[in-house]
Each structure stands twice: as structure tokens, then as C-alpha cells.
């Protein structure tokens, strides 16, 4: 993540008085985004999802929860049962959780962090599924999905 570029972008937004749901796994990208938004004065709701896939997931939840508590950030966890190896199953559960939190906190804003490897993985998945040229583009800054901005 290019921290200065991201910080500059965040300062162009006029939503600092609005709550923002931040998808946070506990990895370096989402922790950096969480901290940047905190430093810029955003009202953050940290959405942490334990997919129950890796043994370390409990430790990651505890780490993120303690980090949020120390900064006074609202922490909203979700623990999923491992039911599928299908990426789409977990994506649907993830976005349903974000939607539930967006409704609870009356905000359309959801932020997630991604890095170059995520983009490569996404493009490769789209290639194997026979996507059109639009599927090979990079991540967009904003995606409007129903009444939410991701």
C-alpha cells in the first residue's frame, strides 16, 4: 500500500463525519488502512470476519479486537463456520455482514484494503473463468453496490 498516496486520497473525501465500516483481517494491508482512517479522524467500525479456515484466526481476532479497544474503535466480529472451499460462499457472507453493519450504523461507506498480490489473484481467477476484457482491469477506488460504496 502506498501510504502517502492513500492518505492524500482520504483527505479528498468529504465523509469524515460519517461512520465507515472497515473490513479488517488483521493483516498488514487492513491494519494500515484502519490506522490511516483513524489518524485522519474517521469514525470507524471495524468489521472482522473469522472464516474458520486457519488455526491462527482466533489469535488474529484477539489481536484486532485489542488494537481497536486501545484506540476506542468499535469492533464488530463475525465467526463463520467452515462450510465451503468456495470463494463465492465466503464473499457473499462477507458482504452480507458489511450490509448488516451499514444498516446498523446508518452508513453507506465500507472500506477494504488490497495489495498487488490480491489484484494478480483476482485477474488470474477471472482468466480461468473466461472473463471479458473488463475483468482484467485493476481495482476501482469505489464500487457502488446497491446503496453501499465499497
Each model region followed by its residue ranges:
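Core alpha/beta nucleotide-donor-binding catalytic domains of modification enzymes
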Residues: 1-150
Amino acid at each position: 500500500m502506498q501510504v502517502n498516496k492513500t492518505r492524500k486520497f482520504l483527505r479528498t473525501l468529504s465523509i469524515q463525519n460519517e461512520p465507515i465500516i472497515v473490513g479488517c483481517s488483521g493483516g498488514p494491508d487492513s491494519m494500515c488502512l484502519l490506522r490511516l482512517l483513524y489518524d485522519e479522524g474517521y469514525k470507524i467500525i471495524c468489521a472482522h470476519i473469522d472464516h474458520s479456515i486457519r488455526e491462527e484466526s482466533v489469535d488474529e481476532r484477539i489481536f484486532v479486537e485489542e488494537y481497536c479497544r486501545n484506540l476506542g474503535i468499535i469492533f464488530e466480529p463475525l465467526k463463520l463456520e467452515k462450510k465451503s472451499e468456495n470463494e463465492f460462499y465466503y464473499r457473499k457472507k462477507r458482504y452480507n455482514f458489511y450490509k448488516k453493519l451499514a444498516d446498523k450504523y446508518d452508513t453507506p461507506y465500507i472500506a477494504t484494503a488490497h495489495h498487488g498480490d490480491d489484484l494478480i489473484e483476482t485477474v488470474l481467477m477471472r482468466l480461468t473463468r473466461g472473463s471479458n476484457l473488463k475483468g482484467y482491469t485493476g481495482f476501482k477506488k469505489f464500487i457502488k453496490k446497491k446503496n453501499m460504496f465499497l
